[in-house]
Amino acid sequence: MHKAQKFALGLLAAAAVATASDVVQLKKDTFDDFIKTNDLVLAEFFAPWCGHCKALAPEYEEAATTLKEKNIKLAKVDCTEETDLCQQHGVEGYPTLKVFRGLDNVSPYKGQRKAAAITSYMIKQSLPAVSEVTKDNLEEFKKADKAVLVAYVDASDKASSEVFTQVAEKLRDNYPFGSSSDAALAEAEGVKAPAIVLYKDFDEGKAVFSEKFEVEAIEKFAKTGATPLIGEIGPETYSDYMSAGIPLAYIFAETAEERKELSDKLKPIAEAQRGVINFGTIDAKAFGAHAGNLNLKTDKFPAFAIQEVAKNQKFPFDQEKEITFEAIKAFVDDFVAGKIEPSIKSEPIPEKQEGPVTVVVAKNYNEIVLDDTKDVLIEFYAPWCGHCKALAPKYEELGALYAKSEFKDRVVIAKVDATANDVPDEIQGFPTIKLYPAGAKGQPVTYSGSRTVEDLIKFIAENGKYKAAISEDAEETSSATETTTETATKSEEAAKETATEHDEL
């Protein structure tokens, strides 16, 4: 009996360990006190049925455990149980992550949803914009992240310090920033003040900035130096490449050995184009479908393509040709010189527009969307997207209301399958809805409200040139699920049906 009791107690202990969590679950009556008593908190607002939330859960747990020793708390709120609390904090989709420094200092989490990224982001949040660096803590500071920046500035050089602080405030989510006025330490690090050293745990190990301290120049130096010469393109790095502001060259290959071989072969090209084009390898077995997004065949590798991120233009290298140093160098040089036309993927132009919603394809995009005489509301959708399917009848109703209104010749309700057509807009998820006002086509307005006919009409009336307010008969309701956006990497619908990994970024 004694042994049985010990065995039972052992099972209970094991269960306690297995179920222990470093993520604190908060409710309405505990939320405010928890935020007030902890200097820095990352809170996740989630729903148990949400596929993206389920995918985040183990990553969030791992990050919470890692950050516990640094006294950075991770919390979560179940919005199906705490509806009022979630509405109070403006939650419109799941998961929503917010950084709290007290109840009055709240900012959205802008990092990736991976344990390492969450950990890195929150550590940077815990640091001051610029940390003091000395000979005693320099080596430790270098290890704070994959890339850190240290300014070596004389104590009397207030101007350089102010410029560096401006950059740090702007980019603090991306890199840890440190500063030292120790001339001997600067000399030991091989620089003379004023200078900035970017320390990194890849490529050549560090990069030095010794030009005049100007915000734009330092920003460019940081972004260029912190990007691997030839990095790895995947879910954790993709958004960073997309936000870098320069073209991205993809090297597709099916094996790690082949990716390394091609990287070594093309490295001199990447070095010559540093700061002009980012280069990265991509696993063709895991993410081969992304080749199709670049207008490459998805069954013929290795392959190479360049994406002009700002204009969302694709420049695929001929897959019938061998990837050699000479061939890729010539291709890249021609791209930089503007000698290559972008490849455009488009469905056929509809022979006739049927229905109240105008169908847009790549070949008629400019003609319809950029018609300067009309306010054009356009939905960028994906056929597999569950939220797009849910929106469809409401969007048709919206189109019908405008088609029979006094604004029928001045307002267009349109849609485009963004998976089958190249569009110049940067689309982060589906559905994305934008209004291109007449007379201001260069300043489209992205819709972020609930997906009801009433609210969409209000959006058009408030942001369009013609202030096209119309009435609608049916009263619509909205919920957080209606405003959720599905990322292009994974549809929530598919996440519910299968646990297999998707091969899109």
Curated annotation (Swiss-Prot):
Catalytic residues of the enzyme: C50, C53, C385, C388
Organism superkingdom: Eukaryota
UniProt-listed GO biological process terms: protein folding; response to endoplasmic reticulum stress
Motif mapping: Prevents secretion from ER: 502-505
UniProt GO MF annotations: protein disulfide isomerase activity
Annotated site (Lowers pKa of C-terminal Cys of second active site): R451
Transferase keyword on record: no
Xref: PANTHER family: PROTEIN DISULFIDE ISOMERASE, PROTEIN DISULFIDE-ISOMERASE A3
This protein's name: Protein disulfide-isomerase
Lineage, broadest ranks: Eukaryota, Fungi, Dikarya, Ascomycota, Pezizomycotina
